[in-house]
Amino acid sequence: MQRLVEIERFDSEESVEVTLRPSAWNEYIGQEQIKKNLGVFIEASKKRAEALDHVLFYGPPGLGKTTLALIIANEMNANIKVTAAPMIEKSGDLAAILTNLEEGDVLFIDEIHRLSPAVEEILYSSMEDFRIDIIIGSGPAAQTLKIDLPRFTLIGATTRAGMLSNPLRDRFGMNFRMQFYSPEELSKIISQASNKLNKKIADEACSEIAKRSRGTPRIALRLLRRVRDFADVANEKDILHSRAQYALDELGINSYGFDEMDIKLLNLLVGANGRAMGLSTIAAALSEDEGTVEDVLEPYLIANGYLERTAKGRKATPSTYKILNVTMPALDDGGLF
């Protein structure tokens, strides 16, 4: 079952996201420092009539990495080729993409940390020297064919920057860490999207949805669409605060943006009586794999101070005890089980 607060994109959401996605800097809300720096680099590249240096965006899913890549291409007046690492299975697949690029084009590779080592090696020379070496034949008769490439910009996006090899990471001239969004930024995003959906929404309703959206635009837009469903069924022309509040409560998203799975995890940690819990123990108790716990459940809770990762495991924070209305243990022996 898919969670409404899931940060990964649902298969059915791609076309909707395209409709609601901003296409220019003045429409893009949030990530102000990244926008400011990119604006300088883009302007400098345009003045020199050069391709923009390679860019790496990293951070949790749903924060706008793909959108920024599309805006960069738009600002550079460049064509963009969008792909994902799992679709590039062999070095020949990447070579075919690279040899079809034109001068100044942008190549966006999502989930770039999932490239195989063989494919990654092709990127090294193409990023640094704008050249690829293709081996024709095998054995003693094998020959290397050098193919020059037009100067292009590679934009990589990853949720696991630590999984990138050092040689690949070092070839990106710009590295940007995407931050979670403030409730105020999300409110603006929700209002903007509501206009595109031709549905008026009260400011208070925007704020209500925003505070339950876990700092993530993808979740905010998903919740907006579900709240709109409730309003439409109730034959309400506008989305009012009371309707947004009712809809989100019915959907099981509380005022902290927690759903049932979050509450289960936090109750599990609180039940440890101040001791740290190992990742494998948590995963087994929740019937989830460790990767899901680490990459999907934990980031928002850690970023907002509800969960602490220590050398000995995971622990609930004072904020967690407070919102769950549980008294903190007087002693903490720091044990692990």
UniProtKB/Swiss-Prot annotation:
What subcellular locations does the record give? Answer: Cytoplasm
Q: Which residues bind Mg(2+)?
A: T66
Q: Where does ATP bind?
A: L20, R21, G62, K65, T66, T67, E128, D129, F130, R171, Y181, R218
Give the Gene Ontology MF terms in alphabetical order: ATP binding; ATP hydrolysis activity; four-way junction DNA binding; four-way junction helicase activity
The source's superkingdom equals Bacteria
Q: Which reaction does it catalyse?
A: ATP + H2O = ADP + phosphate + H(+)
Spell out the residue ranges making up region: Small ATPAse domain (RuvB-S).
182-252
> Which cystines does this chain contain?
none
Q: Where does DNA bind?
A: R309, R314
Region annotation Large ATPase domain (RuvB-L): where it falls in the sequence: 1-181
Q: Is the keyword Transcription assigned to this protein?
A: no
Chain residue ranges for the region called Head domain (RuvB-H): 255-337
Q: Which InterPro entries does the entry mention?
A: AAA+_ATPase, AAA_lid_4, DNA_helicase_Holl-junc_RuvB, P-loop_NTPase, RuvB-like_N, RuvB_C, WH-like_DNA-bd_sf, WH_DNA-bd_sf
Q: What is its EC number?
A: 3.6.4.-
Q: Name one GO biological process term.
A: DNA repair
Q: Which UniProt keywords apply?
A: ATP-binding, Cytoplasm, DNA damage, DNA recombination, DNA repair, DNA-binding, Hydrolase, Nucleotide-binding
A family per Pfam: AAA_lid_4
What CDD domains does the record tag this protein with? Answer: AAA
Output the Gene3D superfamilies linked to this UniProt entry: 1.10.8.60, P-loop containing nucleotide triphosphate hydrolases, Winged helix-like DNA-binding domain superfamily/Winged helix DNA-binding domain
Which cellular components does GO assign to this protein? cytoplasm; Holliday junction resolvase complex
Family under the similarity heading: Belongs to the RuvB family.
* Record's subunit section: Homohexamer. Forms an RuvA(8)-RuvB(12)-Holliday junction (HJ) complex. HJ DNA is sandwiched between 2 RuvA tetramers; dsDNA enters through RuvA and exits via RuvB. An RuvB hexamer assembles on each DNA strand where it exits the tetramer. Each RuvB hexamer is contacted by two RuvA subunits (via domain III) on 2 adjacent RuvB subunits; this complex drives branch migration. In the full resolvosome a probable DNA-RuvA(4)-RuvB(12)-RuvC(2) complex forms which resolves the HJ.
User: What functional role does this protein have?
Assistant: The RuvA-RuvB-RuvC complex processes Holliday junction (HJ) DNA during genetic recombination and DNA repair, while the RuvA-RuvB complex plays an important role in the rescue of blocked DNA replication forks via replication fork reversal (RFR). RuvA specifically binds to HJ cruciform DNA, conferring on it an open structure. The RuvB hexamer acts as an ATP-dependent pump, pulling dsDNA into and through the RuvAB complex. RuvB forms 2 homohexamers on either side of HJ DNA bound by 1 or 2 RuvA tetramers; 4 subunits per hexamer contact DNA at a time.
* Free-text note on domains in this protein's UniProt record: Has 3 domains, the large (RuvB-L) and small ATPase (RuvB-S) domains and the C-terminal head (RuvB-H) domain. The head domain binds DNA, while the ATPase domains jointly bind ATP, ADP or are empty depending on the state of the subunit in the translocation cycle. During a single DNA translocation step the structure of each domain remains the same, but their relative positions change.
- What is the name attached to this protein's record? Holliday junction branch migration complex subunit RuvB
Gene that codes for this?
ruvB
